[in-house]
Amino acid sequence: MTDEWLDTINWSVDGLIPVIAQDENGGKILMVAWMNRDALKRTVETGEAVYWSRSRKKLWHKGEESGHTQIVQAIHLDCDKDVLLLSVEQKGGIACHTGRQSCFFRQLKNGEWVITEPVIKDPSQIYTQ
């Protein structure tokens, strides 16, 4: 397979594209991250999600520290070709570094942000730094 398919994407001026990771079974949105060309290429090659960390300025293989990898079942490109949607099998059932299933665990209710998802596992037990 050639890399021409990467040229179809409307990359940002920084060479990035936002990526939504969605649970393949329930359809729940797990997280939003970023990819550059190399991250997307490695994701396709390995079958596991590899993102670009904007804060650390390096590739980030999801689950490299926690073991909570994302097995990619499908990759979709939106109509404007500037957002990716990954359908994933979330290993360990935890996508968020806070120990929750989803990074979207706060909901606006009556003008206040309310936590709507429990912590599945204490992050101190996940990350041993």
Swiss-Prot record:
It comes from the Bacteria. The keyword Amino-acid biosynthesis applies. Keywords: Amino-acid biosynthesis, Cytoplasm, Histidine biosynthesis, Hydrolase, Magnesium, Metal-binding, Zinc. It is found in: Cytoplasm. Binds 1 Mg(2+) ion per subunit. Binds 1 zinc ion per subunit. It catalyses: 1-(5-phospho-beta-D-ribosyl)-5'-AMP + H2O = 1-(5-phospho-beta-D-ribosyl)-5-[(5-phospho-beta-D-ribosylamino)methylideneamino]imidazole-4-carboxamide. Pathway: Amino-acid biosynthesis; L-histidine biosynthesis; L-histidine from 5-phospho-alpha-D-ribose 1-diphosphate: step 3/9. GO terms for cellular component: cytoplasm. One of its GO terms (molecular function) is zinc ion binding. Gene3D superfamilies: Phosphoribosyl-AMP cyclohydrolase (3.10.20.810). Pfam families: PRA-CH (PF01502). Mg(2+) binds at residues 78, 80, 82. Its main location: cytoplasm. The keyword Magnesium applies. Its EC number is 3.5.4.19. Zn(2+) binds at residues 79, 96, 103. Disulfide bonds: none annotated. Its cofactor is Mg(2+); Zn(2+). HAMAP family: HisI. Belongs to the PRA-CH family. Homodimer. Catalyzes the hydrolysis of the adenine ring of phosphoribosyl-AMP. This is Phosphoribosyl-AMP cyclohydrolase. It comes from Nitrosomonas eutropha (strain DSM 101675 / C91 / Nm57). The gene is hisI.
